[in-house]
Regions:
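Alpha-helical interface subdomain recognition
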Residues: 1-80, 178, 187-350
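FAD-binding core of flavoproteins
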Residues: 81-91, 95-209, 213, 338-350
């Protein structure tokens, strides 16, 4: 298994980073909150850059890239707390529709259609627009609906930049049922959890960087508070948790791309690790910011609230811990030192 990123993936990551950090600044996010809006107005530009069609096959007008590369995009979107529904549309809906050979995947890549997602692990539709379509995973069926054929109730979010809708009823077109629908729902859940984990990595990195800059500028007793050992410990612990979580997420992306039998388990581990790292980063950031960290004056709250919203999305911590527990205690699972050393012995020809 190759854990290295391709040069194309790194180049696209760098382009997305430059664009997002210029386009989606804390000042821009604050203005959206003040206007009671969550529309960044960057969707068409993200389509032109190929970000929305990243996972759509080239034959359908996309870039034909894989999960490992999209993880990098999700991480960059998290770093700026982008309100755009990139994961739901480009990370989940587009590749699922492409698997089914449905034209909507090409329409997403081309920008003529936008399809958001509703799933039992992601029941609230984010940023639903009147011209959108909704890919709904419910019971043993997968269906596609126009937003105009759906009745929704508005739902509140702790994050002011997430505009949620709960589907009450829908006139939908079934596109899969039975075993196929269950298989697609599981794939969607894995993709959603993986890319949300990557977004949490980006949020954690942003809060650590914001805190690092603050403790260098903030002075007490004539010196920067970043020189105090207690402050160093808070941020070094947060940074260590982040760096230990990142390879877990990257490993999950690689195994999911390869359809590894343990991919769902690796995704569960990734969601746990990234969620823990992001929560720890938020707590450390508030601690080192002091009193201002609890106010709206600090940009920190925009990122912290996004973390709180995302940790429960596509399966909360308990959901994924239970999944890992079942795998660990399942005697059929190839886990533990016996498997590890047996594999090593086989590799050496023993």
């Amino acid at each position: 298994m190759d854990f290295n990123f391709s040069q194309d993936e790194l180049d696209l990551r760098d382009g997305a980073r430059e664009y997002l950090r210029d386009r989606c600044t804390p000042e821009v996010l604050r203005k959206l909150v003040e206007k009671n809006s969550a529309d960044l107005g960057s969707w068409s530009e993200m389509i032109e850059m190929g970000l929305v069609g990243f996972l759509v096959p080239e034959s359908a007008g996309g870039l034909g890239m894989c999960n490992t590369g999209f993880v990098l995009l999700a991480e960059e979107a998290g770093y700026v707390a982008s309100p755009e529904p990139l994961i739901d549309v480009a990370g989940v809906a587009a590749p699922i529709l492409a698997l089914l050979g449905i034209d909507s995947a090409a329409e997403i890549a081309g920008g003529t259609s936008r399809v958001v997602t509703a799933h039992s692990l992601n029941p609230y539709v984010n940023q639903l627009q009147p011209t959108d379509k909704v890919l709904q995973f419910k019971d043993d069926a997968v269906s596609l609906s126009d937003a105009s054929d759906i009745e929704v109730d508005a739902a509140e979010s702790i994050d002011p930049l997430r505009r949620l809708s709960k589907i009450v009823s829908a006139k939908s077109i079934p596109i899969a049922s039975g075993d196929e629908a269950r298989h697609l729902a599981a794939k969607a859940a894995s993709k959603g959890a993986l890319f949300t984990a990557a977004e949490l990595l980006g949020l954690a990195a942003a809060m650590i960087d914001m805190s690092k800059n603050y403790v260098v500028e903030r002075k007490q007793f004539g010196v920067a508070i970043g020189t105090f050992q207690a402050v160093k410990h808070h941020l070094s612990t947060a940074f260590t948790k982040l760096e230990f979580a990142r390879p877990v997420v990257y490993r999950a992306a690689a195994t999911l791309s390869d359809d590894d039998e343990h991919a769902a388990l690796h995704v569960a581990h990734a969601k746990i690790a990234a969620g823990d790292a992001a929560i720890n980063a938020a707590e450390a950031a508030i601690q080192v910011h002091g009193g201002i960290g609890y106010t709206f004056e600090a940009d920190l709250h925009l990122f912290m609230k996004r973390v709180w919203a995302l940790t429960g999305l596509w399966g909360d911590r308990n959901y994924h811990i239970n999944k890992v527990d079942r795998a660990v205690f399942d005697r059929r699972s190839k886990l533990g030192p016996a498997t590890t050393f047996q594999s090593a012995g086989n590799a050496e020809g023993h």
